[in-house]
Structures are given as C-alpha cells and as structure tokens.
C-alpha cells in the first residue's frame, strides 16, 4: 500500500535529474505515468484498478522496492512471481494453484510448466486455489497438505461481473450476451477458458481469434478481424480486460462494438 509521506520526496535531484536506473513507475498510487506499451499490460491493468497502490516494474526487485519505500511511502511490498526471487527476504509466500491444472504436466520447465517442484509448497504461508468453479476441492487440498500441512488454504473462483465497452466505457449486464452472436479476441495463456465463460453466459461464440500471450496487436491485423466480424454480422466482439488495454482506438468507429468481460475473484472457503 502507499502511505502519505510526512515530507514528500521529489524524484529529481536539485539539478532536475532523475535518479540513475529509475524503475518503471506505472503508478505512484495517485497518478498513472506509463501506458501499457511501456509498463506492460498487466502492470497497467493493476495501476488502473488499484487506487492508492503504487505499481513499479523492474527486473531488480530490490532496487524498485527501495525506491517504493523511500520515494512513495510504501510499507508493504507485494511481488508478482516473487516466490522464486530469492535475493529478497520474504515475510510471507502466497502461492496460487489453478484447480484446472494444479501441477501442470507434473514436470518442471522446460519439459513442463512447473517453475519449482511440488515440494516447494512447503515454503508457502498461504495457498490460494483458483478457478475452482464453486466445487469442493477436498482431493486437491489433501494432496497439497502432504507437502505443507500448516499453510492456510483458500478456495476461490473467477467470476464474470459485467461487459464494458473498450473505447466508451459503456457497461452492459451479463444477460446482454444471451443469444448474441459473439466474436472472441484474446492474447492470453488459456483462451479456451475465456471462450467457455462466454458460452456459459448464453453467447453463440462464432469466431475465435487467438494470439500469443501478451501479444501487441498490430492495427492492420485488428482491422482485418473487425472487418471479418462485420462481414459475418456479429453482434459484438468480446475480449479480456488484459487484452483491452492493448487495443488502440481506431480512427473510425468499428461497425461491431467491442467489449471486455470484467472478471473478479470470489473467495468461498
């Protein structure tokens, strides 16, 4: 979190120069300074959604952490993918486990998807099970407690909340998807989960355009996709919130309106 400083410090020195190797400051908790192109799509989305929270980007987490404390008044540092960042001492380790593929293929990178062996769960203070679909997870919890019998285990699910127009901010209720012919646009790791969410909400998903995770969309490929959707008489294009921040506003209003699906996390155990 970002606390008010008694004596706010300027980032520049007396000669107006920035400190050397300044971290990327997506937000200082009050003002967003970088767009998604320079900060990255996920940091930008965090900065957009988290008022009062500073968001910094840097390979050197120690350097950016010191900057956050000294210049932004932060008293708590939360690292993304921080469990493997052993240069910085941790007071807590929070591990997320996807219920759909809790241990990936069972193998570590590069053969599989695990960054550490399952036994590393023993270091976790909290283990959050994600995308559980409201179903009991006794079997998975039992498997996890073999590695860590003392960590608090939290069961959660990702749930859609509403649709928001990418360029106008107009919001629609989820029922607006029922019976509509929808085209999906995504550049995420597991697009099928997003597409199935739309189907479960009653949409007829007719077109799915998938790009690699974090893909930076070219305007030409987007326009080609928009034209295809118009030719097929789609009612709407739906993308993810993470992808929405990478969509540049076209010069002309698209024939098919473009929305992102707002997803929020709900803890139920």
Enumerate the language-model features and the residues they cover.
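C-terminal accessory "lid"/substrate-recognition subdomains
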Residues: 102-236
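Short beta->alpha linker loops
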Residues: 59-61, 189, 242
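Short active-site-adjacent structural elements
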Residues: 193, 217-218, 245-250, 267-269
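Short, flexible loop segments at boundaries between secondary-structure elements
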Residues: 159-161, 212-216, 254-269
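Short, flexible loop motifs at catalytic/binding sites
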Residues: 72-73, 87-89, 191, 201-205, ...
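Short hydrophobic/aromatic-enriched beta-strand-loop microsegments
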Residues: 77, 95-97, 153-155, 204-210, ...
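Phosphate-bearing ligand-interacting subdomains
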Residues: 233-252
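Phosphate/Mg2+-binding loops and adjacent switch elements
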Residues: 4-148, 155, 162
């Amino acid at each position: 979190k970002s606390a008010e400083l008694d004596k706010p410090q300027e980032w520049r020195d007396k000669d107006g120069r920035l400190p050397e190797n300044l971290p990327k400051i997506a937000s200082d908790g009050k003002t967003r300074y970088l767009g998604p192109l320079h900060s990255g799509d996920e940091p930008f989305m965090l900065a957009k959604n988290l008022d009062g929270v500073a968001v910094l980007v840097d390979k050197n987490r120690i350097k950016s952490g010191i900057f956050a404390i000294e210049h932004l008044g932060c008293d708590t540092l939360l690292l993304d993918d921080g469990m493997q960042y052993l240069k910085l001492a941790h007071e807590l380790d929070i591990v997320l486990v996807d219920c759909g593929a809790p241990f990936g293929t069972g193998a570590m990178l590069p053969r599989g998807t695990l960054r550490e062996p399952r036994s590393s769960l023993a270091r976790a203070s909290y283990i959050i099970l994600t995308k559980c679909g409201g179903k009991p997870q006794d079997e998975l919890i039992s498997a996890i407690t073999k590695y860590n019998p003392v960590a608090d285990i939290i069961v959660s699910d990702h749930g859609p909340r509403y649709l928001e127009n990418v360029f106008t901010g107009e919001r629609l209720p989820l029922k607006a998807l029922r019976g509509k012919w929808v085209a999906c646009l995504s550049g995420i790791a597991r697009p099928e989960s997003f597409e199935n969410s739309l189907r479960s909400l009653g949409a007829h998903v007719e077109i799915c355009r998938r790009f690699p995770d974090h893909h930076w969309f070219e305007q030409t490929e987007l326009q080609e996709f928009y034209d295809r959707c118009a030719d097929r008489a789609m009612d709407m294009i739906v993308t993810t919130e993470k992808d929405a921040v990478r969509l540049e506003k076209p010069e002309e209003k698209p024939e098919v309106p473009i929305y992102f699906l707002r997803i929020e996390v709900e803890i139920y155990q």
